[in-house]
């Protein structure tokens, strides 16, 4: 079972990635999460199921820091946590941290970098309690960009790079990967309401396209990588021809995801994309 706990509900996925009906979105305010999740677990027969919880983009921060010499992977997160004291708006003692590799071929002479993920300890405790009280067994906590990385990696059959844009109601997220390696993740400040509103649509599309192009340019100029030729787009409003609207302003080709090619018989509810992606298998990044 994979869950993404959002301010307006719970996105879930359980299955083998062969049908869209194995995912869903349970709309609820935070105060009603616990009883509604417990009901969902009982209805689906998930009691005791190993569970991954994914943190949405706005519930964690990621920083690139140089990896200290002589530290084991086991000690790395705790050691680097204290280097975040000037970067966080809360004390490192109230943070829970983990690390994942920064691509060595993108460090551009900055040494051996790692990505340090930080979230509030209170948030982590709340999620552990929520999952446990519902009868699930928490296996791991993931973050949105690594979940989306799984999906981008699956689509990057050539290994030359893939960009994926996921548009939510209030913001978007763009990730760029090469195979299983995440190179870049960016928040895109655009709302679905602005994209739908006739008076604000053109400005919103241009703003979204500009942020996407800037991310592609950064990937090329600052990370020293050849940008992907296409960007795959996932949005909740499938009637809006966003791909063609954005393509006028972005150098790469813009394509909507072909869900049939992903083994689904109908399009996935975009609200479930992160939970669905978190359950995808991903190949290990090549060792250095």
Q: Residues of each region from the PLM?
A:
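Hydrophobic/aromatic-enriched cytosolic interaction surfaces used to assemble or bind macromolecules
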Residues: 1-288
């Amino acid at each position: 079972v994979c869950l993404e706990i959002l301010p307006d509900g719970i996105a879930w996925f359980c299955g083998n990635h062969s049908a869209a009906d194995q995912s869903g979105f349970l709309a609820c305010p935070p105060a009603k999460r616990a009883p509604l999740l417990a009901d969902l677990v009982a209805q689906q027969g998930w009691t005791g199921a190993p569970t991954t919880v994914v943190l949405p983009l706005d519930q964690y921060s990621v920083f690139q820091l140089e990896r200290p010499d002589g530290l084991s992977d086991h000690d790395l997160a705790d050691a680097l946590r204290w280097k975040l004291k000037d970067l966080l708006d809360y004390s490192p003692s109230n943070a829970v941290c983990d690390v994942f590799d920064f691509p060595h071929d993108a460090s551009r002479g900055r040494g051996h970098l790692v990505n340090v993920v930080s979230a509030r300890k209170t948030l982590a405790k709340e999620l552990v309690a929520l999952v446990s009280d519902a009868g699930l067994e928490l296996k791991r906590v993931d973050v949105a960009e690594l979940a989306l990385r799984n999906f981008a990696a699956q689509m990057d059959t050539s290994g030359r790079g893939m960009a994926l844009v996921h548009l939510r109601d209030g913001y978007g997220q763009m990730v760029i990967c090469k195979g299983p390696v995440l190179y870049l993740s960016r928040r895109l400040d655009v709302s679905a309401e602005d994209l739908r509103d006739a008076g604000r649509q053109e400005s919103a599309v241009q703003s979204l396209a500009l942020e996407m192009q800037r991310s592609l340019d950064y990937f090329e100029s600052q990370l020293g990588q050849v940008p992907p030729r296409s960007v795959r787009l996932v949005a909740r409003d499938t009637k809006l021809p966003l791909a063609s609207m954005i393509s006028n302003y972005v150098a790469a080709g813009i394509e909507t995801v072909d869900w049939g090619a992903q083994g689904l018989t109908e399009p996935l509810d975009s609200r479930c994309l992160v939970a669905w992606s978190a359950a995808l298998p991903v190949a290990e990044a090549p060792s250095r």
